[in-house]
Amino acid sequence: MRQVLWLLKRQKMNKDKMKKEKFTFKEKVEEISSKQIKEQQEEIKKLKMPNIQTMDFLYEDNKESEIVYEYPELIALCPMTGIPDIYTVKIIYTPNKKVPELKSLRFYFLAYKDLPILHEHLANKISEDFKKAVEPRKLRIELDVAVRGGIRTKIIK
């Protein structure tokens, strides 16, 4: 909890600073060192996100089933600018003994709303948390980032 408060406080300070001062995008990005980004991302990696609740999968002998969840409303903050990034996350997996309860999966995604996290780290965090909760036979995470600055980004984990 302390880590989340630290991150939110830092984001608020950055937003307050942005309101008070005129700046160019270049100046804003240059204020943040790669060391600061690394420290911030390491703190986020340790954060305990809401649990993804699970239910028993009653057809575990069916090893060929593939389940796909797509959530087009995932929002997280860009750690460089504080601007919200919008994602479509797709989870493609082969179930083992458990499946996620979808309401808890949605609340899990909503918890990222105020977190400053890099795209690549977000895909890995979702993958790690989903594996830990659901223990799938196979898992693929696709994170499609809304186009920003003319660059289309897709992370596949």
Describe the predicted segments one by one.
Residues 14-157:
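N-terminal intrinsically disordered, cationic/polar leader segments
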